[in-house]
Amino acid sequence: MFLTLIAGLISLLLTALIMPHFIKFYQMKKIGGQQMHEDVKQHLAKAGTPTMGGTVFLLVASFVSFLFAILFFSHGKSMGLITGILAIVLIYGFIGFLDDFLKIFKQINEGLTPIQKLSLQIVGGLIFYFLHVVPSGIDAINVFGFPVHLGLLYIFFVLFWVVGFSNAVNLTDGIDGLASISVVISLLTYSVIAIHQNQYDVLLLCGIMIGALLGFFIFNHKPAKVFMGDVGSLALGAMLAAISIALRQEWTLLVIGLVYVFETSSVMLQVSYFKYTKKKFGEGRRIFRMTPFHHHLELGGLSGKAERWSEWKVDAFLWSVGAVSSLIVLAILYL
């Protein structure tokens, strides 16, 4: 644990030291920022805010992880596990980088097409499967302590899990600080699980990324000086999925990641209901004021009768949901 604390602190300090230079470079080059939702008026002031900040914390976390892995985990299965998880983090980070690059530098509003993004995500999932899952001999999903063996079909679960949660965290990254601290809470929970399983290699990766995200949050809390971009959010979602697989606690991510699950579900429900009502009644109707769900909260809280919620209030509410759901998982596992 002491090793993890040192590695996490190094990651935090490096991110905090490098990020101001990244922001300054971004501003000097007058690079266009992330597009804002016009329906949420308080977001319009953020236009031009530097994005792609995930590039910094991903590179820092990867460098520190590889350094500590070589120094302390160079023998046995740990190196393979660390390599497998870092591989999918960097691959998904690269996918997000391409998406951000096309949007910002090439002024292509949609970035990668859905087919291009999904294809690259599947390739990334396959690389993780063959780097980590196959050598580990994993072919079963752990459902509340009971293994459900899937055999070769497990590959489809891995792809669904990694692609699904990478996109879920991406959808969650919509207001200042929300995704970064939500993922910190999730990683802290997996750190506890890793300690109980004596999986100190996974603990190291969690601690290093927690440090990097806390260093990033210094500049990402409201009012944000930088956003993580798809480069950060896609990588973080893939990392959470990979860690849940590595710890053989896949089901826990549905609860630990309740915020990501509900954010994604809100979008799917909204689109489906709108299409259904448009076909049935001739006009589309909505369940939520706006999706993902954090925008619904911004536009009137839970009841809709309240005044608009500030970003801090939305953050606090959803972070609390993430913390409580994580505690529920730990209680189920260890009490």
From Swiss-Prot:
UniProt main location, coarse: membrane
Protein localization: Cell membrane
Keyword Cell division among record annotations: yes
PROSITE patterns on file: MRAY_2
EC numbers for this chain: 2.7.8.13
Membrane-spanning intervals of the chain: 3-23, 53-73, 78-98, 118-138, 143-163, 175-195, 200-220, 226-246, 251-271, 314-334
Signal sequence extent: none
InterPro entries listed in its UniProt record: Glycosyl_transferase_4, PNAcMuramoyl-5peptid_Trfase, PNAcMuramoyl-5peptid_Trfase_CS
GO function term, MF aspect, one: metal ion binding
Reactions it catalyzes: UDP-N-acetyl-alpha-D-muramoyl-L-alanyl-gamma-D-glutamyl-L-lysyl-D-alanyl-D-alanine + di-trans,octa-cis-undecaprenyl phosphate = Mur2Ac(oyl-L-Ala-gamma-D-Glu-L-Lys-D-Ala-D-Ala)-di-trans,octa-cis-undecaprenyl diphosphate + UMP
Pathway info: Cell wall biogenesis; peptidoglycan biosynthesis
Enzyme class: transferase
Topological type in the membrane: Multi-pass membrane protein
Requisite cofactors: Mg(2+)
Keyword Cytoplasm appears in the UniProt entry: no
The organism's place on the tree of life at top rank: Bacteria
Function: Catalyzes the initial step of the lipid cycle reactions in the biosynthesis of the cell wall peptidoglycan: transfers peptidoglycan precursor phospho-MurNAc-pentapeptide from UDP-MurNAc-pentapeptide onto the lipid carrier undecaprenyl phosphate, yielding undecaprenyl-pyrophosphoryl-MurNAc-pentapeptide, known as lipid I.
This protein's name: Phospho-N-acetylmuramoyl-pentapeptide-transferase
Natural source organism: Streptococcus uberis (strain ATCC BAA-854 / 0140J)
Taxonomic path: Bacteria, Bacillati, Bacillota, Bacilli, Lactobacillales
